[in-house]
Regions:
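Flavin-dependent oxidoreductase catalytic cores
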Residues: 1-372
Length: 372
């Protein structure tokens, strides 16, 4: 990808942890993300980093809105890269879904970590709430405010580069601000930024252009999209048209998810099954001629390899399965018969595990898994 080479096609998806104070990286983030590098993921993404404080989903989100946040991100990128992974970050503005309790908390429930925090005024393309869990109707952004946010996306890209990230991704999915502009269900504007598809794409494309202009030419840029919004307002054909425009701006990979326009869900109300979002990645890849990243209930090596061999996507993003198994890539390699002696593991782990397998039953020796 441009001037960057990943050691493999496995990616840790951005997953919010709500453990930051003032948007700063801390020891928790180093440990949480660092273990994925030890597990040999090719690309490790941070959670979404807000481009301004009011763009945070919760007060515990990471940030990329202030130069004072760069040094903490440098600690993280140095560790990830030293262990062989590409360091990637995702930037976002939550729009009308900002100022929320953590997803595992009840609405309006704030715990000891919240320190008396109160909701702040949220914004969006129109004065329409995202649902009962979220703040009351947002303030509809005017054009000067939108231009200021576009500038903040560009400034966040500059900070991400200063922090040493190899890859940047815009979070334009799951009902956050850019997705709010795209969907006619949340964008009821009657100016140049609303109306037909071209109008609704105008603000997200401006944000993408600002990031590309402030992100080095030799570094790749991704964007996460919801291929369908879950309510019938935005569909796969819209996403393919959008991807054509993104490709023209210099976006390198479309990270293809779905849903999240309202409520908690980050996927559209479609039947959940193994790889249920892979067809979206395939449709965008073939329809727009742009590399894609597949995500969504991809659980093991053979399943992931089939997605790649079928040409449905170029990268495999692992989310919750990575939380369950931070060593997913090396386990996948063992499942595929690519590593029988733990040679793909860090030697600090692999040497010991290779010795350990000699004490295991034959049917367990290939992977070194414990007997259940």
């Amino acid at each position: 990808m441009r001037g960057v080479t990943a050691p493999n096609r496995t990616v840790v998806s951005p997953m919010v942890q709500y453990r930051a104070t003032d948007g700063l990286v801390n020891d928790y983030h180093i440990v949480h993300l660092g273990k994925f590098a030890l597990g040999k993921f090719g690309i490790v993404f941070t959670e979404n980093c807000a481009v301004e404080p009011r763009g945070r989903v919760t007060q515990g989100d990471l940030g990329m809105w202030d130069d004072g946040q760069i040094e903490g991100h440098k600690r993280l990128t140095r560790f990830l890269q030293r262990e062989g992974s590409l360091a990637a970050t995702q930037i976002t503005h939550a729009g009308r879904k900002a100022s929320s309790p953590r997803q595992f908390d009840k609405p309006d429930e704030f715990g000891p970590r919240d320190g008396g925090w109160q909701r702040w005024q949220v914004v969006g393309p129109s004065a329409l709430s995202a649902g009962e869990r979220y703040s009351e109707s947002p303030l509809a952004l005017d054009v000067p405010e939108m231009e200021a946010i576009v500038k903040k996306f560009g400034e966040a890209a500059r900070r991400a580069d200063a922090a040493g990230y190899d890859i940047i991704e815009i979070h334009g999915a799951h009902g956050y601000l850019l997705a709010q502009f795209l969907s006619p269900l949340s964008n009821k504007r009657n100016d140049a930024y609303g109306g037909d598809r071209a109008g609704r794409m105008k603000f997200p494309l401006a944000a993408a252009q600002a990031v590309r202009e402030n992100w080095p030419e030799h570094k790749p840029m991704f964007i996460r999209v919801s291929a369908v919004d879950g309510g019938g307002g935005w569909d796969v054909d819209d996403t393919v048209a959008y991807a054509h425009e993104l490709k023209a701006l210099g976006i390198d990979v479309v990270d293809t998810s779905s849903g999240g326009l309202t409520g908690l869900s980050t996927a559209a109300p479609i039947k959940r099954a193994l790889g249920f979002q892979v067809p979206f990645a395939a449709a965008v890849k073939r329809g727009a001629g742009i590399p894609t990243m597949a995500v969504g209930l991809i659980l093991d090596g053979p399943q992931a390899e089939k997605v790649l061999q079928d040409g449905d996507a170029d990268l495999i993003a692992i989310g919750r399965q990575a939380l369950y198994d931070p060593f997913w890539p090396v386990h996948a390699a063992q499942e595929l018969g690519c590593d029988t002696d733990f040679g793909m593991w860090n030697p600090e782990y692999g040497w010991w595990l290779d010795k350990r397998k000699n004490n295991l039953p034959a049917d367990r020796a290939a992977t070194g898994q414990a007997i259940k």
